[in-house]
């Protein structure tokens, strides 16, 4: 089983989608229930089989493990593998998807197609995190747009068509430059093998282009091409504007997948490609990325403060939290990258839970306007408690996973740039401001609005969906070494290779390159 384990985990959802497409018949309630149960079964099996990856994984071995490789088309290879960085994203994906399906039990329109879309999306997301061939990675990375485009465009809100096309075009245009860069890399190296490309040293000699001096040469241009794609995916300021629209229009399950998993592809891309393949380009562009990140943290936190739509507020909160991730990654030290990966994992649980919370009251009241609520704690005490827990985790309360990621990230950046660190720390205060403001407006006070007097608290199924999310948020908050021990050796190797590449290039503190 070991040899094909990664392929089995990757393609269980896609094969299940095919079975659902061929076997399921009818559009009545019974057929819809069969589709839901089958999708839940398929995603649960995927999760339990993926646990074998963790069992067989050796954290001390920093090379790729359980590698599967076979010739594919035109000399490109079908190659999968996991290391200490990618294994966490694989597990996050397989962990979240059964909860997403479970939370979609109330969907009534085109249920079979809805479940097929999510099953295909899971396979494509897993492929992104396991692919060890550049072409294979790109295919998974881009193909993932299609199911998400359909999920927003078919099952979304009133402006779903606009939001879905905006999401599609932003991410597609960002990836055009990455595709050009891949062609350049293949032309220079003759391979698309990611392991081989990580050990290849691309030129960092300065050259002129259109009258401009390109410091860092080819590496800087390749870095910028990949950066364009990953910055949109994160998303980073100022290319974040597709995210609030996509979140607001997406169905609840779509928002959960978008926030919990899809955004993490950008951070994963920086860790898998930018730092190891273009270390000199990454170093030269570090200040640029750090300032964009800190602007994102402060600006989107302030924008979140004035939102009237709950989903939009949480969407802007996501952009701010992803700002901490890019700060941690480009701090390029052990604490920074540990914190960035931890933050991405934690954000997956917390933001996913917050979107589920919004979905629960939207299903009852069919509005996300903050002003439409107030005093819900009187009618929905269990809901108020769960919302409070994840609000506090989002703020970074000690004892929750949200604290560990932010703390490590800030420790990492303090060693690199004190001003960036101080400005980023202000984001912690701002996140407390908008999160507690949201909670007070929705939950506290008297139950004045007539429409809320008959609202029902969470059902048993709705409560059950949150149990694993609460468990993971607490477990990683009080016992973070569970994750840090898993990623530590791989992160240390990444940092060591990055620093050795810089020293070989003769880079000194002011980002100039020694002549050679």
Please identify what each model-predicted range represents.
Residues 1-5, 19-116, 195-206, 211, ...:
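Transmembrane helix-loop-helix hairpins at membrane boundaries of multipass inner-membrane proteins
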Residues 7-25, 40-53, 90-104, 121-123, ...:
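Central hydrophobic cores of alpha-helical transmembrane segments in multi-pass inner-membrane proteins
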Residues 32-44, 162-174, 380-384, 460-468:
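Alpha-helical transmembrane segments and their helix-start/interface "positive-inside/aromatic belt" motifs
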Residues 41-55, 171-183, 393, 429, ...:
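Hydrophobic alpha-helical membrane-insertion segments
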Residues 53-64, 185-192, 480-485:
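Helix-to-loop transition at the C-terminal end of transmembrane segments
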Residues 101-105, 123-135, 148-438, 443:
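Hydrophobic transmembrane alpha-helices and their helix-loop junctions in integral membrane proteins
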Residues 142:
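Short phosphate-coordinating micro-motif centered on Lys-Gly-acidic
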Residues 380-382, 435-516:
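Cytoplasmic/organellar membrane-interface segments at the starts of transmembrane helices
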């Amino acid at each position: 089983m070991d040899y094909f384990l990664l392929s089995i985990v990757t393609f269980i959802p896609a094969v299940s989608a095919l079975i659902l497409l061929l076997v399921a018949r009818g559009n009545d309630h019974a057929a819809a229930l069969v589709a839901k149960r089958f999708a839940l079964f398929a995603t649960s099996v995927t999760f339990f089989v993926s646990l074998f990856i963790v069992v067989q994984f050796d954290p001390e071995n920093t090379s790729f493990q359980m590698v599967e490789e076979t010739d594919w088309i035109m000399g490109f290879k079908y190659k999968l593998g996991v290391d200490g960085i990618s294994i966490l994203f694989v597990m996050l994906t397989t962990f979240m998807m059964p909860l997403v399906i479970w939370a979609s039990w109330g969907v009534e329109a085109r249920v079979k197609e809805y479940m097929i879309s999510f099953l295909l999306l899971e396979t494509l997301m897993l492929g992104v995190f396991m692919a060890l061939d550049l072409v294979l990675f790109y295919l998974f990375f881009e193909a993932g747009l299609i199911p998400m485009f359909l999920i927003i465009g078919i099952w979304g809100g009133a402006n779903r068509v606009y939001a879905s096309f905006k999401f599609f075009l932003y991410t597609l245009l960002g990836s055009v430059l990455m595709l050009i860069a891949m062609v350049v890399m293949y032309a220079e190296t003759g391979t698309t093998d990611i392991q081989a490309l990580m050990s290849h040293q691309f030129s960092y000699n300065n050259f002129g282009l259109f009258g401009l001096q390109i410091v860092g040469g080819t590496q800087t241009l390749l870095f910028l091409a990949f950066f364009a794609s990953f910055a949109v995916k994160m998303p980073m300021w100022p290319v974040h504007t597709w995210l609030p629209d996509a979140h607001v229009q997406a169905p609840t399950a779509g928002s959960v997948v978008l926030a919990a998993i899809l955004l993490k592809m950008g951070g994963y891309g920086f860790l898998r490609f930018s730092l190891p393949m273009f270390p000199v380009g990454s170093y030269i562009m570090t200040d640029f990325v750090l300032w964009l990140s800190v602007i994102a943290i402060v600006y989107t936190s302030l924008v979140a403060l004035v939102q009237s739509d709950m989903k939009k507020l949480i969407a802007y909160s996501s952009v701010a939290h992803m700002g901490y991730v890019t700060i941690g990654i480009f701090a390029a030290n052990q604490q920074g990258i540990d914190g960035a990966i931890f933050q991405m994992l934690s954000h997956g649980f917390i933001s996913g839970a917050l979107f589920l919370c919004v979905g629960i009251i939207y299903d009852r009241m069919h509005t996300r306007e903050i002003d439409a609520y107030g005093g819900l704690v009187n009618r929905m005490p269990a809901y108020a408690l769960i919302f409070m827990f994840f609000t506090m985790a989002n703020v970074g309360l000690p004892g929750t996973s949200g604290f560990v990621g932010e703390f490590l990230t800030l420790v990492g950046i303090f060693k690199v740039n004190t001003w960036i660190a101080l400005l980023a720390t202000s984001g912690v205060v701002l996140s407390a401001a908008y999160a507690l403001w949201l909670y007070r407006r929705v939950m506290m006070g008297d139950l004045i609005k007539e429409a809320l007097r008959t609202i029902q608290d969470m059902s048993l199924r709705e409560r059950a969906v949150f149990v694993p999310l609460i468990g993971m948020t607490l477990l990683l908050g009080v016992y973070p070494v569970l994750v840090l021990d898993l990623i530590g050796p791989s992160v240390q190797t990444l940092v060591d290779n990055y620093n050795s590449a810089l020293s070989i290039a003769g880079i000194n503190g002011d980002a100039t390159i020694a002549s050679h």
